[in-house]
Amino acid sequence: MKKLLIFGSIIVALFAALAFVTSYQQKEAVKDNPYHKKELDPATIEQLDDPNYQNLILPDELEKKLKNKETVTVYFYSPTCPHCQKTTPIVVPLAKKMGIDLKLFNLLEFKDGWDKYHIEGTPTLVHYENGKEVKRIDGYHEEAVFRDWFSSIQHRHQ
């Protein structure tokens, strides 16, 4: 009985230590994060160092751009969305190559964006001009489709 009690105590101590280490790692990962939030979803934490997820736009910043009637192209995505995971490596490098400043809006972290920007599913790319939506594309597509979509918004400015 004494051995069982000692063994049980060791197991409890190991789980407590594991919980502490995991909690500490998550706190360190979100420290000084670009989302300016105290807690982030683990899927977002995984993307913090990914070069495809660096050109973020926060809700206040997007709202300010739209209120100021600026032109902005936004990629609404969720880190847990399988279609976004296939789309991001296509659209982010393509936009950069085409000279489009594609802003990324994380709907997992900022859930109000679903209703506010009328997003029905992810991924969704929306182009705004003078603070108003003028063009949108939803879902996963091949690179050629996104290239044509980006070209169409470029031609609006020529």
Where are the predicted features?
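A short beta-strand-turn-helix
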Residues: 51-70
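Thiol-based oxidoreductase modules, predominantly thioredoxin-like and allied folds used
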Residues: 76-78, 95, 99-112, 121
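Non-catalytic, surface beta->alpha helical segment in thiol-disulfide oxidoreductase systems
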Residues: 4, 126-158
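C-type cytochrome heme c attachment motif
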Residues: 79-86, 124
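Structural micro-motif
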Residues: 117-126
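N-terminal targeting signals for export/organelle localization
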Residues: 1-49
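Short active-site neighborhood of thiol/selenol oxidoreductases, capturing the structured segment around
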Residues: 65-79, 91
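Typically the conserved alpha-helix immediately C-terminal to a functionally engaged Cys/Sec
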Residues: 83-98
